Amino acid sequence: MNEPIDPKSFPSQPLSPYIPMHHIGKGPYKTIFNVLSLNRDHIHWEDYLYKHTPCELVANPETNQQVWFKREDYFAPLSCYMNGKQGINGSKLRQAIWLMVEHLKAGGSPDLIHGTVVGSPQSPMATAVSRHFGGKTTTVLGATKPTTCMNHDMVKMSAWFGSEFNFVGSGYNSTIQPRCKKLIEQQNPKAYYLEYGITLDHTLHSPERIAGFHMLGGEQVANIPDHITDLIIPAGSCNSCTSILTGLAMHPKPNLKNVYLIGIGPNRLDFIESRLRIIGKQANLPHITDFTRCYHDNPDYVYGKKDLQHASKSVSLAGLLMGIREKGESEITLPRFAVHHWDLHTTNWVRYNDLMDYQWGDIELHPRYEGKVMTWIQQHKPELLNENTLFWIVGSKPYIEPMKAACPELSMPEQVPVNEFTPD
C-alpha cells in the first residue's frame, strides 16, 4: 500500500497491520493503519478507506456475557489504544476523508470551513483531515466565546490540530451554517464546506454522490460473520444506519434475522427511508428497502404517508411492511430481515445531550452514543447479548493524549486562534 519507511527518519510510529494477539509494550495495536502520522510523506489516509475494520468477540466479565463488536474505532490514523484510549477514530472520520478526497478531485482546495456544536467530535476530525491534506480549518462556534470555548474537550482538540475559530451569537444551526457559507463566499471560495454531521444533504447533492457516500460505509458490512442473527446499531444522525443497511443489500448475510436501530437523537426514520430509495435506484440495489418494519415507537409509520391523504386507510399489508413504493420502483419481494427501531430521545428515555458511561470488558463505549444504547439493551433486551449478536461501534470517544506520540509537531496554542470575519 505504501513504500517501506525507515522508522528512524521521522518521529511517527510505524505499526504492523492489525493482528489480534500481537502485543508490543502495554497492549495490542488496535488500528488498521500501518503508520501513525499526519504527514502525507509517510502515509495517505485515503488508502485505508476500504480496508475492513475487524469484528471481535469480546466478553464482559461483569455480566458473563459475550457479544461480537464491529470495531470501527480501529479506523484510527493517529493512535492504537496503547493506554486504553483512542484518538480521532470511527466511521465519521472515514466519511470525512472521502468527502475531502472528492472535493480535491473536483478542483477544490484542502482548506475546510464548517460549524458544529462545542461537544461534537466533528470539529477535531475535520481539522485533522484538512491538515493531513495540507489545508487549514475555520470552525464556526455558537453560544460560546474565545475566553470559554477551550473549556470543551472537542474544541481544545480542534485547536491542537490547528483550527481557527469564528464565533456567532447563537448555538443554533440556523445561525452557524449561514456563517460558514458566508466565510466560503467572501474569504475562501475553494475551501470545502463540511456539512453539519459529516454528511451530504440528499436534497442538494446528486444521487451518485449520495450512493457513493453510503456505499463506502456499507463496504464494512462485508466481514460480519455469517452466523450473526442480530445486529445492534446506534441511531444518531443515522448516516451509519443508512450505510449499514446499504451494506446489507451489497453483502447479504445468510442468517441475519433482526436489525435493531436504537435512536439516541431526534427521529430520523424519514431520512433513512428517503436515502435508501435514492441509493437503491442509483446503485441498482432494488431490494435495499425489502425488510419488515417494526418501528416500535412509531407503529403507524409509512414512508410517504404525510404526503398522501387517507394513506392509513388505503395502504395494503405489503405496503405497510415495505413502505409505500414510488412510481417506477421494482415489485415487492419477501423481506430479508426485520428492522426494529426504538426512539429513546423523543420518548424521553434519554436526551441526546445526556451522557451514559458504559464499560464492556476493555471497551469504553462512547457515553453520548454507544453507552446509551448498551445501557438500554441491558435493561430492556438483555437476551440479545450473546454470541449470535453483533454490536456496531460507530466510534469511540477521542482523546488528545493517545495521539501525542504520532503528532510531535502539534502543540496547544497559547491563545485561541480567532478569525474575526463578519459578513458584509
UniProtKB/Swiss-Prot annotation:
Q: Which reaction does it catalyse?
A: 5-O-(L-seryl)-dTMP in DNA + H(+) = 5-aminoethoxy-methyl-dUMP in DNA + CO2
Q: What does this protein do?
A: Converts 5-O-serinylthymidine (O-SerT) into 5-aminoethoxy-2'-deoxymethyluridine (5-NeOmdU) as a step in the pathway leading to thymidine hypermodifications in the viral genome. As a final result of the pathway of hypermodification, 5-NeOmdU substitutes for about 40% of the thymidines in the viral DNA. These modifications probably prevent degradation of viral genome by the host restriction-modification antiviral defense system.
The gene that this protein is the product of is gp226
* Keyword terms: Decarboxylase, Host-virus interaction, Inhibition of host innate immune response by virus, Lyase, Restriction-modification system evasion by virus, Viral immunoevasion
- The keyword Lyase appears for this protein: yes
State what protein this is by name: O-seryl-dTMP PLP-dependent decarboxylase
Where is the secretion signal located? Answer: none
Matches recorded under InterPro entries: TrpB-like_PALP_sf
The molecular function terms in GO held by this entry are: carboxy-lyase activity
For this entry, list what GO says about its biological process. Answer: symbiont-mediated evasion of host restriction-modification system; symbiont-mediated suppression of host innate immune response
| Keyword S-adenosyl-L-methionine in annotation | no
Family label: Belongs to the pyridoxal-phosphate-dependent aminodecarboxylase family.
